[in-house]
């Protein structure tokens, strides 16, 4: 095996001994987690390679300084990478490792803390939320209850790891992605450090993954410099170590795919509602495939991928001439492909900034500036999308068609006999497969186009395995099902909740089935939402002393898991389909009342998830089923923008006159006003919709005479005196009057006969 691959394995597994140490296993000698880790890993023959074992044994200064390793040992690279990922050079720290002899400083029972404890703490204070140790649960909420991780829990994890390392995991270029997936599945809620002098909010998975990414970059950087004496360059004398931290070894890279929302929503054909989710999944998978193409060109792994979602990706790459050339070539190739396939509907842009180890550790206070610079450079790229040659290419590929696609309305592309372009035809073709199958296959044969003469198809597991055997270039993604397999690139967490597919009667009709009801207005509810001030949170939300690349990776992964995995659990049972759920924004369509009720549940879950440190704003519209989806999207987007004005943390409901705080909607409108009215009407034989309509008419009319008329209407009603007095008092207050009108409208929509 080549040295770089051994380094990737070793740097990813360098802290495996921490889990074994915390298990109190009698099978291993006492000592540091490094020593215990190497003893544990040596049990498994495929992993007994010097680059792997040395990275586990000697990734701390004291052990490395006293070792007799060769000058070209990759353990020196793992040591530097571990320091950068940890956010500090730990050379001067006494007892800087977990193990025997440091029991007072390290608490092996300590749970993983929530990253949100420190997020926005300068404005909202520090929190003390931690996660429980539950091996089988993919997603967990932090709580403020006191917790301890027990040695028996760690022992069970060691047994699981032993079984997998013995029987499932392999060592080789086609198997590394499986190991990376394995560490995510098992280590995401294990604290990287149990040092009581530190904040324990970075998981062992996030730390190990970032260490691997940094190590891979350093290896490529030194290789291009023809440097093979890693000890001299990185370790001894120490002045060389400090100098290396100051070198521009890395590139922070941002990749952006623009035009996503217009591509998804700007359709108007008879199958528009049915193909919405398919269009979203297509673009999401396309972005993942783009990232893997780029990483493959660079001979790097998904460890170097910091984040994907919402049409964006961030990567950590080596600052080498080769990497910069690959980025330029890749961007040009992708832009050309997008122009040929999508014209200007979709486009791609890449920006990057060279950075040092000190930048990534924030030891010089430049970490936030690094991200801001990359963001600014990307904005400049997007503002000047096309070069002269690319504009010429666009003009040369214009197709003067006589027909337009009945779904996307494009006329610059060949149209089939069914009046569909090839892209819409393929997207519609995979719609049913998306509901039933969980494997996305990227291969030379398929239904919708991807770059480099490949196509996307959706298969069951047997179908995916057959395609692998037919073509070794096949790439497979599993959806919400982590697997360990040779060519399985990665599991993609995707929120695929779609209530309409759960019942054979509604499956064929899809989203349109949500207007089928016996009572209540037959309308679709549309929600668009995104997190408030997320960009600021990423750049400045983590206080200066805690900023590091590992915490940024932790924060982005937690947000991604909430919206791509946990959201399905939150929506369970609701008549809703998730059209789009990225790392920070959301688009739902469903029965109008389910959309509102679940929006309130989602807001509470998000508050719980983020320890109250983050909020989101939303627009909620209500539409007839045949209303153009493009207008639903744009109009609800306007409502979302209204909700994000001022203090944010709001919802704009139905129109621009109804912008409420979330608590205001739930407590003052629904609980305080709507529910008492609903109960009163349920218990009364005299009052129904006509009574509500009359009240609405009087409340909406600003004439003074209507105050007396409202008082008269209430006095003659059979409502309780307490409720009539409350209604009249609410009508005299401007804000409460709007709340009352909204409550009555909500109730009318609930009880009116279906069309």
From Swiss-Prot:
Cofactor: Mg(2+)
Catalytic activity: 6 ATP = cyclic hexaadenylate + 6 diphosphate
SUPFAM superfamilies assigned to the protein according to its UniProt record, in alphabetical order: HD-domain/PDEase-like
Entry's EC annotation: 3.1.-.-, 2.7.7.-
Keyword Thylakoid carried by entry: no
Superkingdom in the source lineage: Bacteria
Keyword tags: Antiviral defense, ATP-binding, Endonuclease, Exonuclease, Hydrolase, Nuclease, Nucleotide-binding, RNA-binding, Transferase
Region HD domain: start-end pairs: 1-87
Cofactor binding annotation: Synthesis of cA6 requires Mg(2+).
Domain GGDEF intervals: 522-656
Gene Ontology BP terms: defense response to virus
Alphabetized GO MF terms: ATP binding; endonuclease activity; exonuclease activity; RNA binding; transferase activity
Regulation: Synthesis of cA6 is inhibited by EDTA.
Further comment: Encoded in a type III-A CRISPR locus.
Family: Belongs to the CRISPR-associated Cas10/Csm1 family.
Quaternary structure and partners: Part of the Csm effector complex that includes Cas10, Csm2, Csm3, Csm4 and Csm5.
Function: CRISPR (clustered regularly interspaced short palindromic repeat) is an adaptive immune system that provides protection against mobile genetic elements (viruses, transposable elements and conjugative plasmids). CRISPR clusters contain spacers, sequences complementary to antecedent mobile elements, and target invading nucleic acids. CRISPR clusters are transcribed and processed into CRISPR RNA (crRNA).
PANTHER family linked to this entry: CRISPR SYSTEM SINGLE-STRAND-SPECIFIC DEOXYRIBONUCLEASE CAS10/CSM1 (SUBTYPE III-A) (PTHR36528), CRISPR SYSTEM SINGLE-STRAND-SPECIFIC DEOXYRIBONUCLEASE CAS10_CSM1 (SUBTYPE III-A) (PTHR36528:SF1)
Domain free text: The N-terminal HD domain has ssDNase activity. The C-terminal GGDEF domain has the cOA synthesis activity.
Stated name of the protein: CRISPR system single-strand-specific deoxyribonuclease Cas10/Csm1 (subtype III-A)
Lineage, uppermost ranks: Bacteria, Bacillati, Bacillota, Bacilli, Lactobacillales
